[in-house]
Amino acid sequence: MRNEATMRNWSMGEYLLRRYRERQPLLPLGAENVDELRQWQAQFRAKVWEGLGILPEQKCPLEPLTVDRTDMGDHWREKVLFQSEPDMTVPAYLLLPKDLRQGERRAAILACHGHGNGKDDVCGITHGEFHRVHAIRAHNYPYALRLVREGYIVLAPDWRGFGERRLGGAYGGKDYCDVLLIKCLLFGLNPLGLNVWDGMRCLDYLQTRPEVDGERLGCVGLSYGGTMTLFLAALDERVKAAVVSCYLNTFGGFALQLGNFCGVQVPIGILRYGDLGEVAALIAPRPLCVEAGRRDDGFPIDETRKAVEVVRHAYRGANATERFVYDEFEGGHQWHGEISIAFLHQWLPPNKDDRTD
């Protein structure tokens, strides 16, 4: 009797991990050439969209407004607002290099923040608070500043649930990301999908700016910023180059095993069809750089390597292996930047005439 009892399982954690290990995805990536890859991408992309919940049926006017312009020494920082939906405003910082000439149009990059204080972190804004200074330094977080100093125009928005858009009133100290997901699910909405929508509206906004070459847009981000970069680049082909830092992994690794995710990172039902490697494969043949720290406790490096092999397969099928760069560095959960900045300069230089590929 006792031996029979010990063979039973009542752990939900083990139950879900077993389901993950035994699952047979309905849309595995097996494409070996360009035509097969395109066909697979169309099928898998449709399933990713399904997992993002109900989205607006059409785009509303942006109604852009610049509410502040600050001299930051080597660049201008504008505080801008625009509508992603009729009743939803996106607050963002637009960083403009001071050497931008009259009539010049440059490449622009969407700098996606991770968990923390939203757009302030990637722009290096600490408000004099020690914990912000420490967190920004530890994660090498202000990549929006690095990019504007490299000559790019940079847009850094607050995603829904973060920064000025943080959800208040989570009862009993519950995780606000999880509460946001639960509230959204009551309406058939998904905060990841809504943020992807807002990311698309960010690209729309950049394309209205006279300083921006609307055909040369990029996207970068660390952690949840990597989530946003991955999904936005996978779903919107206006993203011509992407840098995903400390996010690409497997759901079996960082999510089901470690529980290192939250309610704004959930493409519902995705494991029926594939995993994050397959989502990243949707970006091929556009240039993609993936950063991963060997000492990142939240994203096991062995699981990242599994996902990277899926991505490599896609770029081989696209005859574009030179457009995928994997930077595995000695470090933890942080923006690396040593290879990715050179990658951006190669595939999406600030000035069109500087492209070297």
Q: Residue ranges of each PLM-predicted region?
A:
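Short beta-strand/loop motif that positions the catalytic acidic residue
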Residues: 283, 290-292
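N-terminal targeting or regulatory segments adjacent to alpha/beta-hydrolase or S9 domains
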Residues: 1-76, 84, 353-357
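Glycine-rich active-site/cofactor-binding loop and its immediate structural neighborhood
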Residues: 69-130
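Alpha/beta-hydrolase fold nucleophile elbow
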Residues: 211-223
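Glycine-rich nucleophile elbow surrounding the catalytic serine of serine-hydrolase chemistry
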Residues: 221-231
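Cap/lid segment of the alpha/beta-hydrolase catalytic domain
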Residues: 104, 110-197, 207-208, 253-257
